[in-house]
Swiss-Prot record:
Its main location: cytoplasm. This is Phosphatidylinositol transfer protein SFH5. Heme binds at residues 127, 147, 173, 175, 209. CDD domains: SEC14 (cd00170). It comes from Yarrowia lipolytica (strain CLIB 122 / E 150) (Yeast).
């Protein structure tokens, strides 16, 4: 029996783990009474939200959870079950399409093009635009639904028929004008809850994470934290003290303010509702498919199989004294300022890091 292209990179033990999870999936879906992950159905059931079922997309998503739990079936089942329960209750797809409070408008941007105009989904988190932390982070429910909405809108643009980078996004945290000397209760609470959500429910969704315009003081903290994180996690983080150095890692397509030749960031941003746009595009493609002459077909296969997602679960940080230490991401940048911590750090790293940051600040 031949191995599908999207699974050929896997080791025999990993293939076996995936097969076991596939066999357990119907029970998990029945238990949670939910069938959608990142906008895609995990079974052929027609009811409920999500795009049409595809075995390839299902496998790519399952591999993210397996990778995050080192292919331990019991732990993966628990993580997947918890994520499905959370999605049913929290309704992240609604977060993606909802109109959020205008106070969040300037905090996040999504772009979908990279070098040479090639597809590259990137989250830009502009925490320097926060003028009133208590107003933004004090509204914990509103902030979290907005932040989850940004993530879901980004995931809707990814290609879940491709393992590795094709089904992952870049994330840039810009800390320009952010003060790390104060840590109010609202900001700390927002940071901890966002970290928990992204670590628990969005494993292996970040290819790399960049922290730019980071004060030298915080770089010292990042370097210290690196010693306690896995190589896979550290390999995802890149830290730059000067935002204009970002082009060294990503190329000239980034905006001029980040050292590239691209236009203003806000002009590069996609529309507010890419989820609907993606669904419309998929509908049109299906209509074209039905118009094809008999004998032609397209299969949901993968070309060159890439490496499945990295190992650490995805985490998130807010502009507090604990920014970098809470997220996973990519290879350290080729500059002296790029001693970054890991990609999607585990929740337990959040607190120690923030404490280290406070001590350093003092």
């Amino acid at each position: 029996m031949s191995i599908p292209a999207h699974l050929q990179i896997l080791q025999p033990s990993e293939l076996e783990a995936l097969k076991k999870l596939q066999d357990e999936l119907p029970k998990i879906l029945e238990k949670t009474d939910y069938n959608e992950m990142y906008g895609h159905k995990l079974s052929e059931a027609e009811d409920g939200p999500g795009k049409a079922y595809s075995e390839v997309k299902r496998d790519i998503i399952l591999l993210k959870f397996l990778k995050a739990r080192d292919y331990d079936i019991a732990q993966t089942k628990d993580m997947l079950t918890d994520a499905l329960k959370w999605r049913k209750e929290f309704d992240p797809l609604d977060c993606a399409s909802a109109k959020h409070d205008s106070k969040f408008d300037k905090l996040g941007v999504i772009t979908d093009k990279g070098a040479g105009g090639e597809p590259q989904v990137t989250n830009w988190n502009l925490y320097g635009a926060v003028s009133n932390r208590k107003e933004i982070f004090g509204d914990l429910k509103g902030f979290l639904r907005w932040r989850v909405g940004i993530m879901e809108r980004s995931l809707a643009l990814l290609d879940f028929t491709k393992p590795g980078a094709g089904s992952m996004l870049l994330q840039i945290h810009d800390y320009k004008n952010v003060s790390f000397l104060r840590l109010d209760a609202e900001t700390k609470a927002a940071s901890k809850e966002t970290i928990r959500v992204f670590q628990s429910y969005y494993p292996e969704t970040l290819e790399r994470k960049f922290f730019v315009n980071v004060p030298t003081l915080m770089q010292f903290v990042f370097g210290f934290v690196n010693k306690f994180l896995s190589r896979e996690t550290v390999a995802k983080f890149v830290v730059y003290s000067n935002g204009k150095d970002l082009h060294k890692s990503l190329g000239s397509w980034v905006p001029a303010e980040y050292g590239g030749k691209g236009g203003p960031l806000l002009e590069m941003a996609i529309s507010d509702h890419p989820v609907q746009e993606a669904e419309t595009k998929e509908t049109k493609e299906k209509e074209k498919e039905t118009e094809k002459p008999v004998g032609t077909s397209e299969t949901d296969t993968v070309g060159d199989a890439a490496e499945p997602a990295p190992t650490e679960p995805a985490a998130e940080t807010v502009p507090t004294t604990e920014p970098a230490p809470t997220e996973p991401a990519a290879e350290t940048a080729p500059t002296e300022s790029s001693t970054a911590p890991s990609a999607e750090p585990a929740a337990e790293t959040a607190e120690p890091v923030s404490e280290g940051a406070k001590v350093a600040a003092q």
